[in-house]
């Protein structure tokens, strides 16, 4: 529930009764009040609580006070994670000393001070402690638990007032220590790792050491340290100069978090998922490694998704992750990825564009991800947000290649949106249709029928489908005159069919259809009605069917209307069976446009065209119920 954002004060109330018994609660990033937390969870016999990054409405002292209200929890709580939880000024965490059963305590990224460390060091069962990025200046208090502390994590202790020899003098006495993390932000230039690696007899039982971000860390020094400790199973070397020798790949059973190869990068992304500085570095290494990738790597894509989800407001993480996602989901690679994973990464990309609306490269990466046909056609994601992004890029002129991609994406997404959603895109539609018509006029001036030209016609056709608003903007921007010029300039059937499809959409709008009843337009439609290409003939017939259906257009020229109906009748007679192949029809959104034609019993020619079209769609569409 917490992961999906469904745990709130209201929904948490389902845990207030005694119908269920909770032992573990994992509620990262939730927004709960102190009262709701107390009522929902503190009557349960909890042994593990993870409240990482909960909303500032729920403070660390509130959590501790609530848990302390249960004598059973005070005695039996084994694991408490309060990473990145807010603490009011002048409030300490000394009350943690009441939880005598605690084995594991993590207070990373909180205002945890020396007096708090003194207090928790007295806990009789404490075996694992994480004080990363806290306000601790002196770790000497750890000597109180030197005979029981097995894991110590002190990443980025930026306030530490002890020099490296003084720190090592304390660490040396932690005889039971199996895991030690003294990793640091590289910009701090900490030499603690360098001094540690020189010690021959320190921590002989160590199995895990993290010195990522340390300065002057070399392969030779790390190899020597590990060879003296054969039980070592993990070493963290990201953001250092070590990890590149064959020793690290040859040593059996050793895991390395670093940047030398894909295995090390994967381990780094997994281990450091909550540390943005290391996630960013690991993602940068991953980007470099995947520039020419040919293998499908769903595990890596999942790690990228975790990094994005854990650091939504960190621009370097989001930007680098978006670039990695592109490398991992290029065309054929995307086909091998699970749909749910692709949906997750696509959703995260769109969230990133909303969090950083003015960062162009991030917006561009999100758009580029949609050029994957697998993602665009098969993956469930918010089509509305995608269409909004694509329409905006249609109007950008700094990159013709990207604009062509945006036009192509728009042409596909337009058919995925409901009429209501299209109505919400009014501002984007106005700008995009104007820009699409500008592109067509440019291509006409160049007499160029390239792929951009075809995508643009297709986009206009699909944007105007069952969208009177788009049809209105098309007509207001002299779109009719423009597409008639297209028909005069190009005689290729694929171009003709796209223009006729667009004119069908305009003809379906009663308020606009009368503007198509001009000699120039009618003559052009009649000539295309007799085309040997079935798609062209069919779509030309559709325009005539819609125009002749409304007698109001023909009050002064009923004779011409009669001729058009006769032409329509003869054309349909010459067509093959409605079961014939004609892929253009599968783009119909619904049968709504045929309704006024079917009830027009005074014009059987119009009815016949509508019936032919409906039968064709139903016989060719594998899922006609979706239409």
From Swiss-Prot:
Keyword Repeat: yes
Short name of any one Pfam family annotated for the protein: ZER1-like_2nd
Per-repeat ranges for LRR: 123-146, 203-227, 409-432
Keyword field contains Repeat: yes
Matches recorded under PROSITE patterns: ARM_REPEAT
Keywords of this entry: Leucine-rich repeat, Repeat, Ubl conjugation pathway
Family: Belongs to the zyg-11 family.
Function: Probably acts as a target recruitment subunit in an E3 ubiquitin ligase complex ZYGA-CUL2-elongin BC.
Protein known as: Protein zyg-11 homolog A
Taxonomic source organism: Mus musculus
Lineage of source species: Eukaryota, Metazoa, Chordata, Craniata, Vertebrata
């Amino acid at each position: 529930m917490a992961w999906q954002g469904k745990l709130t004060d209201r929904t948490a109330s389902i845990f207030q009764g005694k119908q269920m018994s909770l032992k573990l609660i994992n509620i990262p990033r939730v927004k709960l009040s102190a009262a709701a937390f107390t009522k929902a969870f503190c009557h349960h016999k909890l042994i593990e609580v993870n409240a990482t990054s909960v909303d500032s409405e729920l403070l660390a002292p509130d959590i501790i006070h609530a848990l302390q209200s249960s004598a059973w929890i005070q005695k039996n709580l084994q694991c408490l994670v309060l990473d990145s939880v807010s603490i009011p000024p002048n409030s300490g965490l000394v009350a943690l000393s009441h939880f005598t059963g605690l084995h594991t305590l993590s207070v990373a990224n909180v205002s945890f001070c020396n007096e708090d460390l003194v207090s928790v060091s007295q806990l009789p069962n404490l075996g694992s402690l994480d004080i990363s990025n806290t306000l601790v200046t002196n770790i000497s208090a750890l000597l109180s638990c030197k005979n029981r502390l097995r894991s110590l994590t002190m990443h980025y202790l930026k306030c530490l007032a002890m020099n490296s020899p003084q720190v090592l003098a304390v660490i040396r006495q932690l005889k039971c220590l199996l895991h030690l993390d003294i990793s640091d932000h590289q910009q701090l230039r900490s030499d603690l790792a360098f001094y540690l690696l020189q010690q021959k007899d320190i921590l002989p039982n160590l199995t895990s050491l993290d010195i990522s971000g340390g300065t002057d860390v070399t392969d030779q020094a790390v190899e020597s340290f590990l060879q003296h400790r054969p039980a070592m199973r993990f070493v963290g070397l990201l953001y250092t100069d070590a990890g590149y020798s064959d020793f690290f790949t040859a040593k059996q059973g050793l895991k390395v978090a670093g940047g030398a190869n894909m295995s090390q990068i994967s381990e780094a992304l997994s281990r450091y998922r909550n540390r943005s500085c290391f996630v960013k570095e690991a993602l940068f290494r991953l980007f470099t490694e995947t520039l020419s990738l040919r293998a499908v790597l769903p595990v890596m894509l999942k790690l990228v998704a975790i990094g994005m989800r854990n650091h939504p407001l960190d621009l370097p993480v989001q930007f680098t992750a978006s670039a990695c996602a592109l490398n991992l989901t290029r065309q054929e690679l995307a086909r091998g990825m699970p749909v749910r994973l692709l949906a997750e990464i696509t959703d995260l990309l769109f969230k990133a564009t909303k969090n950083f609306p003015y960062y162009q490269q991030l917006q561009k990466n999100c758009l580029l991800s949609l050029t994957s046909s697998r993602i665009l056609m098969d993956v469930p994601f918010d089509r509305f947000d995608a269409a909004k992004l694509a329409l905006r890029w249609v109007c950008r002129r700094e990159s013709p290649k990207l604009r062509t991609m945006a036009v192509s994406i728009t042409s596909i997404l337009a058919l995925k949106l409901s009429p209501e959603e299209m109505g919400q895109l009014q501002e984007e539609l106005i700008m995009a249709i104007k820009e699409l018509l500008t592109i067509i006029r440019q291509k006409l001036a160049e007499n160029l029928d390239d792929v951009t030209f075809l995508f643009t016609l297709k986009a206009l056709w699909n944007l105007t489908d069952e969208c009177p608003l788009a049809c209105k903007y098309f007509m207001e921007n002299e779109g009719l005159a423009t597409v008639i010029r297209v028909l005069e300039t190009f005689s290729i059937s694929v171009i003709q069919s796209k223009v006729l499809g667009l004119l069908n959409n305009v003809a379906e709008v009663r308020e606009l259809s009368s503007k198509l009843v001009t000699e120039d337009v009618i003559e052009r439609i009649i000539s295309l009605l007799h085309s040997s290409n079935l798609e062209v003939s069919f779509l030309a017939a559709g325009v005539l069917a819609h125009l002749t259906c409304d007698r109001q257009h023909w009050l002064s020229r009923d004779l011409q209307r009669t001729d058009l109906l006769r032409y329509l009748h003869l054309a349909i007679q010459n067509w093959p069976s409605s079961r014939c192949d004609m892929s253009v029809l599968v783009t119909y959104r619904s049968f709504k446009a045929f309704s006024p034609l079917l009830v027009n019993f005074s014009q059987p020619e119009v009815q016949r065209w509508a019936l032919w079209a409906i039968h064709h769609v139903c016989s060719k569409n594998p899922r006609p119920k979706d239409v």
